[in-house]
Structures are given as structure tokens and as C-alpha cells.
């Protein structure tokens, strides 16, 4: 099941995901970006803030402001833990 966040129209706030090591070994997220989509239409894209909480956990934050009331967006994170490139999606609802 996809994570979900709710926005009121006009809100601008951070949406954060936590990336954790599955094998309890240290890792580094070397880059992270996001795309906010309404259907197939890209509304915003940018670079995530990367905050390492510990050797085995990093938080990725995207500051977004969805602009269409009643819309359902997809916020797609793409991040790199060399040699891997991973993706994660969050559903964004605007009321």
C-alpha cells in the first residue's frame, strides 16, 4: 500500500520519507530528487534535502505545494545509494 499525505489547497509543506538499511549495514544516499505529478502532468520537480539520522537511516524531504483542489498527486522520490538507484512513491490528496 502506498503512503498518503493530505494537503489543504494553498499549503506548502515538507513530505518526508525515511530510508533504512535492510541489512543493518551503513549506507550513504549520494543524491535524491523528487517529481510531483498530477496524472501524467509534471507540476514540480526538485532536489530533496538529505538528512542522515544514523549510519543505517536517512530522511529525504521534499518541499511541495500542490496547486489543484480535489486532485490526487503522485510524489515520486528517486534516490541513489551506489551502485543502486531506487524509487519510492507517496500519494498526495488536496482538499
Language model features: what each stretch is:
Residues 1-95:
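Contiguous segments within soluble domain cores/interaction surfaces
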Amino acid at each position: 500500500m502506498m503512503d498518503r499525505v493530505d494537503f489543504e489547497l494553498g499549503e506548502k509543506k515538507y513530505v518526508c520519507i525515511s530510508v533504512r538499511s535492510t541489512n543493518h549495514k551503513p549506507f550513504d544516499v549520494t543524491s535524491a530528487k523528487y517529481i510531483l505529478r498530477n496524472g501524467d502532468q509534471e507540476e514540480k520537480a526538485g532536489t530533496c534535502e538529505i538528512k542522515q539520522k544514523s549510519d543505517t537511516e536517512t530522511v529525504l524531504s521534499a518541499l511541495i505545494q500542490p496547486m489543484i483542489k480535489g486532485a490526487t498527486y503522485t510524489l515520486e522520490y528517486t534516490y541513489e545509494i551506489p551502485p543502486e538507484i531506487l524509487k519510492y512513491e507517496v500519494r498526495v490528496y488536496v482538499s
